A protein has these predicted regions:
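Conserved ABC transporter NBD signature motif
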Residues: 60-75
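Conserved catalytic motifs of ABC-family nucleotide-binding domains
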Residues: 151
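Helix-to-loop junction immediately C-terminal to a conserved catalytic motif
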Residues: 52
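Catalytic Walker B motif of ABC-type/P-loop ATPase nucleotide-binding domains
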Residues: 155-158
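Conserved ABC ATPase "signature" region
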Residues: 97, 101, 108-126
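Conserved ABC ATPase signature
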Residues: 130-134
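ABC transporter nucleotide-binding domain
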Residues: 174-269
Length: 313
């Protein structure tokens, strides 16, 4: 039996005849970063709210660590919303202490935990700085620290990198990885940044029109779905280009082979895995490859293939 931290079983949510979420069943494993993607209006926010107990489903149920969600202990889940939920007139340290007190964290545990969060999220030098004077990146990192001050087993991150510069984004990404790899937390991540979902997620669920349409690892999604990788190849003898095109076109999972400005463009699912066979066909023609490059299929390609739209449409 799979060791799930959260199980959504046949979740459905209806609003006056509109079905926002339609019979959704998902299992989120303990200690994984679980990406949750979908176009605007797809039902992902409604789904997550039901899965963490903020919204009652019309039907279906949610099991958290073997218990009905209605019976889990306070503080099991930490929420980091996209909107900054900060006290502008408090310092970073005062904010963390206040949130810890709300969760009744004992002082002997609270103090070292506050300091560790300030260190891990590069806020130590701003510990006594009033929140209103922090940069946008610092505020977003503090927003995350407030969500995890009570050491929740499950952390929900809603667009955590929104508006961040690349340096701040890397700090945040490293901390998210550490929550999984060092602390063993289960992280649910929603994001419109495809590279973020790809880099951080162990598995990704893509939903549209309230239904789950695909659930797999980023690597498997890119291998199996989308327009395919592109191999751009230049032969030592361009006169052999058409011969190679005829050799490769009938091959299984080759989507297209065309000549562009004296080079050959080969589009195929999991093209990297097919490179050895491509090279065998080149050798058969008695030519060599002078130049080659590969552009891998992206998660953006996969998303558009499955939903027919961009992430923010």
């Amino acid at each position: 039996m799979m060791d799930y931290m959260i199980e959504a079983q046949d979740l459905t949510k209806k609003y006056e005849g509109l079905t926002a979420v339609d019979n959704l069943s998902i299992g989120i494993k303990k200690g994984e970063v679980f990406g949750f993607l979908g176009p605007n209006g797809a039902g992902k926010t409604t789904s997550i709210k039901m899965m963490v107990g903020l919204l009652r489903p019309t039907s279906g149920k949610v099991i958290v660590n073997g218990k009905d969600i209605k019976n889990i202990e306070k503080g099991t889940i930490g929420m980091c919303p996209q909107e900054l939920m900060l006290w502008e007139n408090l310092t970073c340290k005062e904010s963390l202490n206040l949130m810890a007190d709300m969760y009744e964290v004992p002082k002997n545990i609270r103090d070292p935990r506050v300091q560790k969060l300030l260190d891990d999220l590069f806020l130590s030098e701003k510990a006594d700085t009033v929140v209103s004077k922090l940069s946008g990146g610092m505020k977003r990192r503090l927003n995350l620290a407030l969500a995890v001050i009570h050491e929740p087993e499950i952390v929900v991150l809603d667009e955590p990198s929104e508006g961040l510069d690349p340096q701040s984004r890397r700090v945040l990404w490293n901390y998210i990885r550490a929550m999984r790899d060092v602390e063993g937390k289960t992280v649910i991540l929603t994001t419109h940044i495809m590279d973020e979902a790809d880099q951080l997620s162990d598995r990704i669920a893509i939903i549209d029109h309230g239904k789950l349409i695909r659930l797999d690892t980023p690597a498997n999604l890119k291998k199996e779905i989308g327009e395919g990788d592109v191999v751009d190849m230049k032969l030592s003898d361009p006169l052999k280009n058409q011969d190679l095109i005829q050799e490769l076109t009938p091959q299984e999972d080759i989507i297209s082979v065309v000549e562009v400005k004296g080079r050959i463009n080969i589009r195929a699912l999991n093209a990297i895995g097919k490179l050895p066979k491509m090279m065998q066909r080149v050798e058969k023609l008695g030519v060599v490859v002078e130049d080659i490059s590969v552009r891998q299929n992206t998660l953006e390609d996969v998303f558009i293939e499955l939903t027919g739209t961009g992430l923010r449409e």
